[in-house]
Amino acid sequence: VLPPMPALERFWDASARVAQISGWLVQEIGRKDSVRTEDAYTFSLFRDCGIPIMMRKFPQYIETLAIANADTERAFTEVEESRHPTSHAVVGCLLGQSWWLPENTCQAIRHHHDFVSIRAGAGALQPAVRRLIALSQVAERIDQEMTGQNRSCEWEKMGEACLDLLELNIDDMPQLQAGATELMGKEGN
């Protein structure tokens, strides 16, 4: 169904690493807002599942990814929707619903680039949805620092709000980075 692309292997490897780190973060910083380890893992694994579908449907989507990853002002999905009739977040949410993923997971997939709602605080999204997004953003940042891959501007747009939501601060990141590096070393990744 999907064309063989070396980028997809790297994509799924990164998704798996971010999922592992997200689940570990729940254990490390504590369960809150009914978000369990397995919820964080599942969401982080599938949050970008719309990307391969967009790649298949729109031949120029690779270019869109490059533009969206480099945009410091607009939401990632806003860039996508300026070039295509939908975004990977909408496609991923629909795919998650068709797989009967929990509604909080589907909503988190739909809104995981919505930095305005993350910054807005309580009321914009359900607390569990916001927490799932925050966990995955912190995990993605840790993964990017560990691997030097998949750089984007999402941390600059959402990082501070995600740390606040998780009751962390930037000074906690080196310790989390060290713990995640140890975890991934033990996992053989």
Regions found by a protein language model. Give the residues of each.
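A short structural micro-motif
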Residues: D114-V116, L183
